[in-house]
């Protein structure tokens, strides 16, 4: 049976977001999804697994409130930050009428969710230094409801200037909402907009436990916003969005002791990142290394070395960013364990220009 006549045209023509797992590369060293290389251990207690969980578990919310420094009524828990990206569009954007803005090169799920929900989008590229083009944004605010800014930006790893974000918040006041995706902010907490949350009611912050907390498989994220916005999001979120095991582990992860463990992980990532950057500078295949405040590095390689293909053939999986505007021949390298970083370096140093 041909189902095509039943399918919405936008879904029929949709190109799904190519997540690291969906690409289905085979390998032994996974440095393509910005995951922590070692799984943390938490004890599971599932006595009430026969019961539906609370829609918004209070203990988990209170723990994250203590960690983030905001009031509990400013927090929504979701299945990763990805779910909040979608929920915000459902609440604020009318299909085939309203617009969102995002600024490539950046995270791909803003575009994908807009296409799924039939919401128009304007892609306003960043400047050459990957900072916001505020004048272009200001001139294209007609019918815009949401502006998604990833900070630190994925995949470039840079921080958006605080004064630019403050200026943007003032530009769009009473016009649109700024959604600041802070998935990687735990690696550079000084750059967070959290201190602006009470000052600017049009600011929304997205967070996750997938990166610094090493819980990507858990799928647990948070939206920080004005309580009125949080209440709107609870209207459209599914009745039981967070599974009981996720609530249990996430609540444990946000206790003071386990937050200390997370801080230790972050220090290890910083050390490995510095070591990897220093070693990459000695590799003849490397054309440019971009500064990073995150758990990954964006690197531009000379094309004749065929780095992505060569490393993939040896079981080392990186993330090719060449499809993004301005990132031709660029690969994103997750900061793995010390041994994984050493393996990447030793493999790159063996590559010879004359080999290809």
Swiss-Prot record:
Encoding gene, per UniProt annotation: hisC
Keyword Transferase listed: yes
UniProt pathway: Amino-acid biosynthesis; L-histidine biosynthesis; L-histidine from 5-phospho-alpha-D-ribose 1-diphosphate: step 7/9
Gene3D superfamilies: Aspartate Aminotransferase, domain 1 (3.90.1150.10), Type I PLP-dependent aspartate aminotransferase-like (Major domain) (3.40.640.10)
Entry-annotated residues carrying N6-(pyridoxal phosphate)lysine: 211
Catalytic activity: L-histidinol phosphate + 2-oxoglutarate = 3-(imidazol-4-yl)-2-oxopropyl phosphate + L-glutamate
Alphabetized InterPro entries for the sequence: Aminotrans_II_pyridoxalP_BS, Aminotransferase_I/II_large, HisP_aminotrans, PyrdxlP-dep_Trfase, PyrdxlP-dep_Trfase_major, PyrdxlP-dep_Trfase_small
HAMAP family the UniProt entry points to: HisC_aminotrans_2 (MF_01023)
Organism: Blochmanniella floridana
EC number(s) given by UniProt: 2.6.1.9
Listed name of the protein: Histidinol-phosphate aminotransferase
Assembly with partners or alone: Homodimer.
GO MF annotation list: histidinol-phosphate transaminase activity; pyridoxal phosphate binding
Record keywords, A-Z: Amino-acid biosynthesis, Aminotransferase, Histidine biosynthesis, Pyridoxal phosphate, Transferase
Family recorded in the similarity comment: Belongs to the class-II pyridoxal-phosphate-dependent aminotransferase family. Histidinol-phosphate aminotransferase subfamily.
Record-linked Pfam families: Aminotran_1_2
UniProt-listed NCBIfam families: hisC
Cofactor: pyridoxal 5'-phosphate
A Gene Ontology BP annotation from the UniProt entry: L-histidine biosynthetic process
